């Protein structure tokens, strides 16, 4: 039987300089292959890692778009449909680790975690994604993460769509055989911030939720301290680095770690409590404790509420981030934090669920491979780019504000003019509605002694008939009183009679 390979559609879109999106549509029952070249390694002796993940076939609805998380942080990224975000999970397929040697890479470790039927991933000189006898269960998004040392991760995406077949059930994932180990439910709960006055005694309470375990185990709690630094705007905790502290991107210098909590290795450990023979049954955990000399006389664990602790006579230098890590059989399994500070030293704390270098900020970097000096200067250059974007945004916002003020002023003047004109028209209208003189008496009326009240309304015609003598041209002025509350209107009339 001959296998017919056909690649129907392959389009590549450059995304923010650090990612490629390949879109493949394959008819059901056919096969397709796409090759994704590797990024050239840079420094000999460094690690080069690749990880393939898969988001299942709920994610056929995809697109690329311009995303702005903040006014100055915008980038082009992959946009997924609502069904993808609601029903699908990103499944890790395999991870390969290489070492860079003379400009090439040599594989030193490979681990297949899950498998998708009819999908083959090649790990040779250049990666290949092969689809044989495609069915709808193969559809989805395949993502390759590539990283050389501690440099910015590269992202390659292959969106696979399968045409002309009814929906199959989701594939049965094949998992490798691994040694089983007992596990327990372990979590820590506490308040995340506490503000104190200098000289206070404070209690930091942490509740431990421990599920049942069939075996005797080792339980250890470590209290790590990241001191407050006035140059920090906020503090960031990189959660993956708590569970994998030896990852290259988690290990940083002391100067770089003043504002973020990454590897446990870089952070001062001020206290620890360890129990070798712990059980969730009738036996109670008995801990051996150790306190760092910097807080020896002031910090003590609260028993039996370990890892809760009490600190006496707290000072300004005690302000900062305290992270409690729980290790089950020597393996980090849970963690929590509390930020202790005075009012003046309070900072916000943000939890980041990626290792340093991942996430949307990595897309802001230039896509080209940089040398050592350029890599060390990335932080300052990205800050300059953000500042430039902020300046443009501020100028635009100021211009819009000035324009809005001008529009309000001009509109107010126009409204005032219209109101004034309307009042004049209303005044003239009221004057026209009230009785007025048909003709005005002159000084040569002779014996006529008609009161002014009789010249209005019903007596107007009568008065006009009685008048026979022609009046000479003269000027006269009279005041018309409309009402007590109405405005006074003076009208000059030139009479021609």
From Swiss-Prot:
Phosphorylated within the acidic cluster. Phosphorylation determines whether endocytosed viral gE traffics to the trans-Golgi network or recycles to the cell membrane. GO terms for cellular component: host cell endosome membrane; host cell Golgi membrane; host cell junction; membrane; viral envelope; virion membrane. It comes from the Viruses. Keywords: Glycoprotein, Host cell junction, Host cell membrane, Host endosome, Host Golgi apparatus, Host membrane, Membrane, Transmembrane, Transmembrane helix, Viral envelope protein, Virion. Residues 1-398 are virion surface. SUPFAM superfamilies: Immunoglobulin. Gene3D superfamilies: Immunoglobulins. It is found in: Virion membrane; Host cell membrane; Host cell junction; Host Golgi apparatus membrane. Belongs to the alphaherpesvirinae glycoprotein E family. Interacts with gI. In epithelial cells, the heterodimer gE/gI is required for the cell-to-cell spread of the virus, by sorting nascent virions to cell junctions. Once the virus reaches the cell junctions, virus particles can spread to adjacent cells extremely rapidly through interactions with cellular receptors that accumulate at these junctions. Implicated in basolateral spread in polarized cells. In neuronal cells, gE/gI is essential for the anterograde spread of the infection throughout the host nervous system. This is Envelope glycoprotein E. The gene is MDV096.
